[in-house]
A protein has these predicted regions:
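Active-site beta->alpha loop and helix N-cap motifs at the rims of alpha/beta catalytic domains
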Residues: 1-44, 199
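Solvent-exposed, flexible loop/coil residues
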Residues: 11, 50, 76, 173, ...
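C-terminal alpha-helical cap/extension of soluble enzyme domains
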Residues: 103, 110-204
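Hydrophobic alpha-helix-in-membranes signature
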Residues: 2-3, 38, 88, 150, ...
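A generic, residue-level signal for flexible/boundary positions that often mark functional hotspots
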Residues: 4, 40, 107, 167-170
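Short, solvent-exposed amphipathic alpha-helices that sit
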Residues: 17-21, 50, 152
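Catalytic alpha/beta core domains of metabolic enzymes, predominantly
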Residues: 23-31, 38-147
Length: 204
């Protein structure tokens, strides 16, 4: 759940009142809420103190937080201050460091095209290949970030499935142009990238 972000410069008290109002109105013990901290987009975010207040007020409801601040120091502070609280870095760049501090995993847009590489690190983060696996997924992420992220991900799927319909995006986003698309696919080719597919079920 995002904080209310239309008004900027609002206080922790105001955000607390908004979140608590939603929880109280739902009024269900089954509710599990994940906070979405993404100040690069929303500008408004969840401070450490506010997260602590919400966890204390709703210990059975506040289930976790996705930290898309891009600021490792903030993610690390969340992990250190709230052990047992499910914190997910918003980029796989921080996956290994996060897991070593108790992160639950990561929630990242680029998993749409690199789920196998990211999952491999998640499964082997305590093994001898962990640093190498992290370097590989970081290199790919940095390549993707050199382009508008969502149009780039859509273009990759379109290219590897040979289906241009996948490249469509909703306004106000616009698809990558021909030059950018060609450059992106060339950059991926240099990395030996392939779009991993799920195994096909065998016929009985």
């Amino acid at each position: 759940m995002l904080p209310p972000f239309y008004y900027k410069g609002v206080s922790d008290d105001g955000i607390f009142a908004f979140i608590s109002g939603v929880i109280d109105k739902v009024g269900s013990p089954a509710l599990r809420l994940f906070l979405y901290h993404i100040p690069p987009m929303a500008v408004v975010g969840f401070s450490l103190d506010l997260v602590g207040r919400l966890i204390t007020a709703y210990p059975g409801t506040l289930a976790g937080l996705k930290d898309s601040s891009g600021d490792w120091s903030n993610t690390a502070a969340l992990l250190e201050r709230f052990p047992g609280f499910a914190v997910f870095p918003g980029s796989e760049v921080f996956l290994l460091d996060g897991l070593r501090k108790g992160a639950a995993g990561c929630i990242t847009a680029s998993a749409n095209v690199n789920v196998l590489g990211i999952r491999k690190l998640y499964d082997n983060w305590q093994g001898p290949q962990a640093e190498t696996l992290q370097a590989e997924i970081t290199t790919l992420r940095n390549t993707l970030q050199a382009y508008p992220m969502v149009p780039a991900l859509k273009r990759i799927v379109a290219h590897y499935h040979n289906d241009p319909n996948w490249a469509a995006v909703r306004p106000p986003l616009v698809p990558l142009g021909q030059a950018q698309s060609a450059a992106l696919i060339a950059d991926l080719g240099k990395l030996g990238f392939t779009l991993g597919e799920r195994p096909q079920a065998k016929a009985a």
